[in-house]
A protein has these predicted regions:
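Conserved, mostly hydrophobic/aromatic
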Residues: 33, 134, 189, 199, ...
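Conserved alpha/beta catalytic core and glycan-binding cleft of carbohydrate-active enzymes
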Residues: 101-103, 254-270, 315, 319-320, ...
Length: 560
């Protein structure tokens, strides 16, 4: 199927189409729609919904350039998330709606309206940034790593040992990477073009992934302790880079000090932090039934105070002195605060954002949501999403080797992969990003792979890797380099993807490193790639094309 999209009217939330990307409530905003010559628009109106009630604003023809008419209207931003869409009447008596999903003859759903978000401006440094994801145990070891005493749970491995295929032992396999090793390799990360270092959890735990925290008070001594994090962040900041932490607000480990204080102890202050299934507090709700990961109960005011609310909370502590993290990626954000009839997720995420803003308004908040994330990402808290539905899945399904089986992890997170053509990939992408306000879309992670899924290269057809990396770097969002992608590492599932980096073979990876560096450098030199709009031009089986547009210029991208 070949789809030509260049002849459709277009609008998005970028500066070429919206006069103020970060308005305050009560401010007036002008919006423009681009209508190709010959489409035949005779009247254009903007439908807004102040306080939920539809209201129409007349647009006027506002200049033209060769082959294009511009229509413009102004309205007042009445609500924190202000929805709008366009109605375009034609000379032949027909009318079409234009919303974030595209052009429609029939009335579309309100959920896919364009949205302007008022207040709580995301940090400017996140626009156009490139992220590098670090899994500390497998990234690099500093000179002092080997001198640390290992806990009982750890099963030591040599750096060149393969990941244990017996998944009963994988989480305990300990390679000894630490934060000092990350600091020593900042040259490498920056050389790839990355300016955000995203660290998976650094708190003490009983696994190498550390998503089963046993405390949030200190950095794991196995990673070098608090001092190592302070040193890493200072070194990164000295280079103009940012460091993002990883915090799990859905659960902790069953060895966590709060859980240990409550387990089997009815009446303990921490009892209200968890969901108990018996009066003795010996059985409890956990993440997906995994007993080592008890689930937090966010009905507890004391849990909120200790963990997410105010200057003394865990959320605040690591953003302030002396640590100065630049933000959080929240693990399992989609499940946080949700259990049966409880849905405290909106409250929890807004409290986290408010606390972060009070400590340092120049911090970034990303939430993990593995599926359709739009409903939770209206711009009220999360600046962007770590999701697989809008970028990862369409790119995989288009550029995978036809008929190749889905690896473990990917199927769990985003469903079984399929064989799609380019037009399918574009259609799916447009479907899933339609619900994001523009400022959320530009800060949502474009990940080809992560620590939770197979490596893209495992499934990619010949020649597809440069195309996929190019899409990650040029589509709206935060491109993500998962450690090891630049080495061409493989991985059949999430665990197998966490292979220690082969620093001794750095020279053999230079071509791929250069690929990342060249593509990332475009984001420094082309303002269209930071927050510029995206207008689709073409989609067919083997090629897609789009224009990234900004007041400074237009960049046309063709992927084939």
């Amino acid at each position: 199927v070949t789809v030509s999209l260049s002849s459709d009217p277009h609008h998005d939330g970028s500066a070429l189409y919206v006069s103020n990307l970060d308005p305050e409530l009560g401010e007036s905003v002008r919006v423009r729609v681009r209508v190709p010559d010959g489409w035949g628009a005779t009247r254009v109106r903007v439908r807004v919904r102040p306080d939920g009630e539809p209201f129409y604003v007349e647009a006027t023809r506002h200049g033209s350039v060769p082959h294009v008419e511009w229509w413009e209207a102004a309205f007042t931003v009445e609500n924190p998330q202000h929805p709008y869409r366009f109605r375009l009447d034609r000379g032949d008596g027909t009318a079409h709606w234009l919303n974030a999903r595209g052009l429609h003859r029939l009335d579309p759903r309100d959920a896919d309206d364009f949205r302007i978000v008022a207040g709580d401006v995301p940090p400017a440094w996140s626009a156009g940034a490139v992220m590098y994801q670090v899994f500390p145990d497998r990234f690099a070891r500093s000179a002092t790593a080997s001198s640390r005493e290992l806990p009982e749970w750890a099963e030591p491995a040599a750096w060149t040992d393969p990941v244990d295929p017996d998944r009963r032992h994988t989480a305990a396999q300990f390679y000894g990477g630490d934060l000092g090793g990350v600091e020593e390799r900042l040259d490498h990360i920056q050389g790839l073009g990355a300016d955000i270092v995203y660290l998976t959890p650094v708190f003490p735990a009983r696994s190498n992934h550390r998503y089963d925290a046993l405390s949030f008070e200190h950095v794991d001594p196995l990673l070098g302790g608090d001092g190592a994090l302070i040193s890493l962040v200072e070194a990164a900041h000295g280079r103009g880079m940012r460091v993002l932490g990883d915090l799990t607000t859905n659960h902790c480990g069953d060895a966590h000090e709060w859980f240990q204080a409550a387990y089997g102890t009815p009446g303990a202050p921490e009892s209200e932090f968890f969901y108990w299934l018996d009066a003795e507090q010996l059985t409890y709700v956990s993440w997906l039934g995994v007993p080592s990961l008890p689930k937090f109960n966010w009905n507890s005011a004391e849990l909120r105070r200790r963990f997410i609310e105010g200057p003394d909370s865990v959320v605040a502590k690591w953003l302030g002195a002396p640590f100065h993290l630049d933000g959080w990626r929240i693990d399992v954000a989609n499940m946080t605060g949700r259990y049966r009839t409880d849905d405290l997720n909106p409250e929890v995420r807004r409290i986290i954002r408010r606390t972060m803003t009070e400590v340092n308004p120049d911090t970034l908040l990303l939430g993990e949501f593995t599926g359709d994330a739009a409903a939770d990402f209206a711009g009220d808290a999360w600046h962007g999403a770590m999701t697989y539905a809008n970028f990862t899945r369409p790119v995989w399904n288009w550029l995978r080797t036809p008929g190749s089986p889905a690896g473990g992890g990917l199927s769990m997170i985003v469903g079984e992969t399929q064989d799609w053509d380019g037009s399918d990939a574009v259609a799916s992408h447009r479907e899933f990003v339609a619900g994001f306000p523009w400022r959320v879309r530009t800060r949502t992670m474009n990940a080809l792979d992560t620590h939770d899924i197979p490596r893209f290269v495992n499934d990619a057809r010949d020649g597809a890797v440069p195309v996929a990396v190019g899409l990650a770097m040029t589509m709206p969002g935060l491109p993500v380099i998962w450690q090891g992608d630049e080495f061409g590492l493989t991985g059949s599932d999430g665990e197998d993807s966490r292979t220690p980096l082969p620093w001794d073979s750095l020279s053999s990876a230079r071509d791929r490193i250069a690929l990342y560096s060249r593509l990332a450098s475009l984001r420094d030199t082309r303002p269209e790639l930071a927050e510029g709009g995206l207008r689709w031009l073409h989609a067919s089986a083997e090629a897609i094309a789009f224009a990234r547009e900004a007041p400074e210029g237009v960049l046309v991208v063709v992927a084939a």
